[in-house]
Amino acid sequence: MATILVLHGPNLNLLGTREPGVYGTITLPQINQDLEQRARDAGHHLMYLQSNAEYELIDRIHAARGEGVDFILINPAAFTHTSVAIRDALMGVSIPFIEVHLSNVHKREPFRHHSYFSDVAVGVICGLGASGYRLALEAALEQLAASAKP
């Protein structure tokens, strides 16, 4: 059984009401419940955290190593474009991760085109709405299964 941690960055607690034309109408609790059920059905454990505070996400990443977390799915949200500290935390714990974005950041303002995470992530999924989280979970489970084979 693998343990997967899902991290949601700033303002994602507003999903469902914040700019639904960009982010959709699904709420964060709905996304979390869906992922948790899919992980459980596959025989794995999933944990999640949403925070608007950079230090809380960093502390959670640090704790993940000691907890034996096997994979991280992260939507850094606005921290994507600003947080060297979260990048360093992810690199410091050496837990593979997939970067997820609900919107296609490359179709948006130029300042959203740069990510401090993409070049060190296993992969990046953007622009597919809440489906991106499901696809990221599927990819993580495939990666974990492949790494478990002798």
From Swiss-Prot:
* PROSITE patterns per UniProt: DEHYDROQUINASE_II (PS01029)
Write out the entry's keywords from A to Z. Amino-acid biosynthesis, Aromatic amino acid biosynthesis, Lyase
Q: Which InterPro entries match?
A: DHquinase_II, DHquinase_II_CS, DHquinase_II_sf
Q: In which pathway does it act?
A: Metabolic intermediate biosynthesis; chorismate biosynthesis; chorismate from D-erythrose 4-phosphate and phosphoenolpyruvate: step 3/7
> What reaction(s) does this enzyme catalyze?
3-dehydroquinate = 3-dehydroshikimate + H2O
Instruction: State one Pfam family annotation.
Output: DHquinase_II
Subunit structure, briefly? Homododecamer.
Indicate what this protein is called per its UniProt record.
Answer: 3-dehydroquinate dehydratase
Instruction: Identify the species of origin.
Output: Pseudomonas syringae pv. tomato (strain ATCC BAA-871 / DC3000)
Q: What gene name does this entry carry?
A: aroQ
